[in-house]
Amino acid sequence: PFGKAYLSPILDMFNGEVIAWDLSTSANNQQIRKMLQRAFSKHKNLEGLIFHSDQGWQYQHRQFSEKLKQKGIIQSMSPKGNCLDNSVIESFFGTLKRECFYGREKEFLTFKQLHKAIANYIYYYNHKRIKDRIKWMSPIKFRETFISNYN
């Protein structure tokens, strides 16, 4: 099976949608830049949003903080050793591992195979996987329904 990979997603707490993500063979600044660029190209008005993360070195980096500040995004970090602040993303990671990875580890012989499986899973998670918290809809459907009802 393929070795280690690092997934860096942005999860919208409104509907649980994975807004942007990147998978890399190492945790690095390029991975975080790509993830942010994907999020910024998908959503234009980000003023006042809160970006919460753990205290990983990538999220403490000056360039990362500057990019958030340029878009008017407020940076928030969990205190050290406080996993409860990150329970939403940790829950997503647990669901992804349970539904996409566990029992299939030996299928992913290359990074490309793992990347494709995660891309397919995130599409499924956003578009098809229903959740009771959002009225038994998928994250995308919930957002679309909310917007159409709001307008």
Label for each model-derived stretch:
Residues 1-151:
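Charged DNA-binding/catalytic regions of mobile-element recombinases
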